[in-house]
Amino acid sequence: MTITPQEALQRTIEHREIFHDEMLHLMRLIMRGDMSPVMAAAIITGLRVKKETIGEIAAAATVMREFANHVEVQDNSNFVDIVGTGGDGSHTFNISTASMFIAAAAGAKVAKHGNRGVSSKSGSADVLDALGVNIDLQPDQVAASIAETGMGFMFAPNHHPAMKNIAAVRRELGVRTIFNILGPLTNPAGAPNQLMGVFHPDLVGIQVRVMQRLGAQHVLVVYGKDGMDEVSLGAATLVGELRDGKVHEYEIHPEDFGLQMVSNRTLKVENAEESRTMLLGALDNQPGVAREIVTLNAGTALYAANIAESIADGIQLAREAIASGKARAKVDELVRFTQQFKR
């Protein structure tokens, strides 16, 4: 039984759930551009007001994956995405992007899915661009990049063309909607493992259970209690972990790993150029908060990728990748590899 957009809107007004098959139908209408902008705006606002359920988010992510331009990766072992929802308002340098280079240097394969900054001063696409990486690759070129360098960056607009059908609505609404949390759930390379940062503590338990429904393998969803969508040095971090089909929720602290709790204030940047400088400083093994926080996040990603037995082991591997110069060398390797596809 399909549901009309009007019926769906009424359901959200009454704070009742839209069922899985109904949500699939509604999302397909939106992604095809077959729903009027007024109805699309009303429904996604209604969902936000009543609070989206795990089932609704999982169905929406399923459709977004259907409509994506996929990257076919042959070998799925130790394959991870490091991503944040963004929108945490912290304006820090690109910690997850720096972590990608370290994780790849330690043997993970990383499919990073990102965009230019919307809420942040520098999105992952902005800082990679500033580093000299060609971010505008076709899906087969991204697959080649992952196979060759252990890293691939998927520029969201190239992989989710159907999003243009809702872009104007989202821009005009100007508030967070379900689409703000779908990005990290819709990796076009289908990475089975993930380190996902979220902008609200409630999303830790929600997003990890959505990933469970979507068939992911090893996922850590994190929220720093100082408001960061990363594993934080400035506070405890809430973790939702999916492993072997089961979800566990717990808290970790920097001191658990022999790290000092320090404010993230010094990590703030104004633009992609400042982010680039801080990222390279951390990878060049310059002592400081930037190096420590990327070590912590890359270590967590290596645990998610099943290269490390624990976060603590991952941190040790991350330290070695930085100290040996391998992590810094990965930047030059990705620049060289992607520049050959410059159009």
UniProtKB/Swiss-Prot annotation:
Regarding protein family, the annotation reads: Belongs to the anthranilate phosphoribosyltransferase family.
Q: Which Pfam families match?
A: Glycos_trans_3N, Glycos_transf_3
Offer one example of a GO biological process linked to this entry.
Answer: L-tryptophan biosynthetic process
**NCBIfam families per UniProt:** trpD
Pathway membership, UniProt: Amino-acid biosynthesis; L-tryptophan biosynthesis; L-tryptophan from chorismate: step 2/5
What residues does 5-phospho-alpha-D-ribose 1-diphosphate bind to?
84, 87-88, 92, 94-97, 112-120, 124
UniProt binding sites for anthranilate 2: R170
Q: What is known about what this protein does? A: Catalyzes the transfer of the phosphoribosyl group of 5-phosphorylribose-1-pyrophosphate (PRPP) to anthranilate to yield N-(5'-phosphoribosyl)-anthranilate (PRA).
Keywords, ordered alphabetically: Amino-acid biosynthesis, Aromatic amino acid biosynthesis, Glycosyltransferase, Magnesium, Metal-binding, Transferase, Tryptophan biosynthesis
The record's GO molecular-function terms, alphabetically, read: anthranilate phosphoribosyltransferase activity; magnesium ion binding
Which residues of the sequence carry a binding annotation for Mg(2+) 1? Answer: S96, E230
User: What is this enzyme's EC?
Assistant: 2.4.2.18
Indicate what this protein is called per its UniProt record.
Anthranilate phosphoribosyltransferase
Task: Explain how, and how many, cofactor molecules are bound.
Answer: Binds 2 magnesium ions per monomer.
Name its co-factor(s). Answer: Mg(2+)
Organism name: Burkholderia ambifaria (strain ATCC BAA-244 / DSM 16087 / CCUG 44356 / LMG 19182 / AMMD)
Which residues does the record give as anthranilate 1 binding sites? G84, N115
Q: Give, as one word, the top-level EC class.
A: transferase
* Catalysed reactions listed for this entry: N-(5-phospho-beta-D-ribosyl)anthranilate + diphosphate = 5-phospho-alpha-D-ribose 1-diphosphate + anthranilate
A GO CC annotation recorded here is:
cytosol
